């Protein structure tokens, strides 16, 4: 059975645009074949109750799986210790820690099934010449990681094209 | 490994195509051009990961396979962009939820993915789910492998989507 429904908004509605500051970004590049070993190390990091704010991964280069992991500043020490572990260095092709960074994120109704959300957000940022380090979208969530001091400007830029409560 | 991981559900996607763009010079903004074309063509991107480092940009996107002919027609009008895109047909996503931002859980799922032998092409956490992109032909088998180590509620919903929402 096919049901056709129309969902239309003049301005795209979000549940609010949030900015988190003073975060740490760890970008760990591994060979795809080392995924299980990286998972083991990440799981061990979690034993210290370390929480991650965001994880994105993709092939930045053909044979290199890049993980971008974002943590609150209070976990920076654990993160630096994690990246310096011989077992992590052994499986990594490169590790970059960038801090402080800022994360902007928002969610909206049925975002996972709708076209044009990423384009509208990217265009609004580009118009204000705001560059991101990483962007990720899945399900109903959109995340951007920015260098320090860009989060508020980005929120203002996106607030001009998206509706917020 | 014991059956110690707890999740509320695992969801599998429909068949998609993975599109990648890699640009190793400044002066081009392929992501913006790609996103604009997809938006104008009313094509949804259920998964997107885009990163910039120095002058290098690398983007990974998923498009439902049924939308690929329309996407290719739209991209054909931008020759510079078209030559920089690579397509990997027949991928799909496995979403495990909730992750609760818990590194022990996320790490264990990554380890299981690695052990399953299924390739990982992309990953993104949302507010609740951890979504991983792999070969469509291996989706069900990988989900079954995960469920050997992850406890799901007895009444969890089916893995496969029961409704298909299409933007027009």
Where are these regions (language model features)?
Chain A
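A conserved regulatory-domain signal marking ACT and ACT-like small-molecule sensing domains
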Residues: 1-165
